[in-house]
Amino acid sequence: MSASNPDGAITRIMKIVNEKGLHARASAKFVQLVEKYDATVKVSRNDDSAGGDSIMGLMMLAAGIGTSITVSATGPEAKQCIDALDALVSGKFGEEE
């Protein structure tokens, strides 16, 4: 489910379902996808947040399997970016398990 914030951001809560969580390879795929869109992305978990364009920042969120992350995007392609990221996360980052 997506929601628009007063600042125009589109926000969606995504559950991490891949076995290894938001590790280096998954974070790299996330960043590569973000970079395809004209959007600025922020990812939050609990009280921590990171830019969607930072592999290290995403890894520092320590989002393991079963945790939820809040992903917000602004910009002309924010909705498309959020939809693509949701598909990536729910698709286990394309990992075979």
Q: What is the role of each PLM region?
A:
Residues K15-I65, A73:
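Compact, glycine-rich, soluble single-domain proteins
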Residues S2-D7, F93-E97:
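Short, charged, intrinsically disordered terminal tails
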Residues D7-I13, S68-T70:
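Intrinsic-disorder/low-complexity, polar/charged segments enriched in Ser/Thr/Lys/Arg/Asp/Glu/Gln
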Residues S2-N5, A28-E35, K79:
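A broad, low-specificity signal for short, low-complexity segments enriched in glycine/proline
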Residues I65-E97:
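C-terminal structural segments of small proteins and small subunits
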Residues M1, A9-T11, N18-K20:
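Positively charged, low-complexity intrinsically disordered leader regions
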